[in-house]
């Protein structure tokens, strides 16, 4: 599951936070691909739901950070917090063509302002 661009309305710096599952033991390349899926999904969602904040993030250099959680349960706990805060986010599930089973939730993404 990937967690992407989220926004706190009081902060000044925008950044995208990608929350990646560490328990899946994905290769570095797989992690990079899942993070890219998360970033793209979140940016497209922000374009529709919060274009002004997306423009701000783009203008500030598109800062991104990747953090980890140790289970799918923890990932969905983070998603619940993002939803409660009104942050744009998306869940990324894998197609299962390479390293992990189809439908495995790998990360979440959100757009945030910190």
Model-derived segments and spans:
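Solvent-exposed alpha-helices and their adjacent loops that cap or buttress functional pockets
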Residues: 8-12, 57-59, 98-102
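Compact, glycine-rich, soluble single-domain proteins
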Residues: 36, 41-64, 68-73, 84
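Conserved small/polar residues in nucleotide/adenosyl-binding loops
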Residues: 111-114
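Mid-chain, well-packed structural core segment of small domains
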Residues: 61-101
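Short hydrophobic/aromatic beta-strand micro-patches
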Residues: 19, 66-70, 109
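Terminal signal-anchor or tail-anchor transmembrane helices
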Residues: 1-2
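Glycine- and Gly-Pro-enriched alpha-helical subdomains that act as flexible
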Residues: 6-49
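Short, solvent-exposed beta-strand edge segments and adjacent coil->beta transition regions
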Residues: 15, 62-64, 105-107
């Amino acid at each position: 599951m990937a967690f992407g661009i989220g926004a706190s309305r009081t902060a000044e710096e925008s950044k995208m936070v990608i929350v990646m599952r560490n328990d899946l033991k994905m290769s570095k390349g797989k992690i990079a691909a899942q993070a890219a899926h998360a970033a793209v999904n979140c940016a497209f969602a922000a374009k529709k739901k919060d274009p002004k904040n997306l423009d701000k993030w783009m203008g500030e250099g598109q800062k991104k950070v990747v953090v980890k959680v140790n289970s799918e349960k923890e990932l969905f706990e983070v998603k619940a917090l993002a939803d409660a805060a009104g942050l744009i986010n998306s869940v990324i599930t894998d197609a299962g063509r390479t390293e992990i089973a189809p439908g495995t939730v790998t990360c979440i993404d959100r757009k945030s302002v910190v």
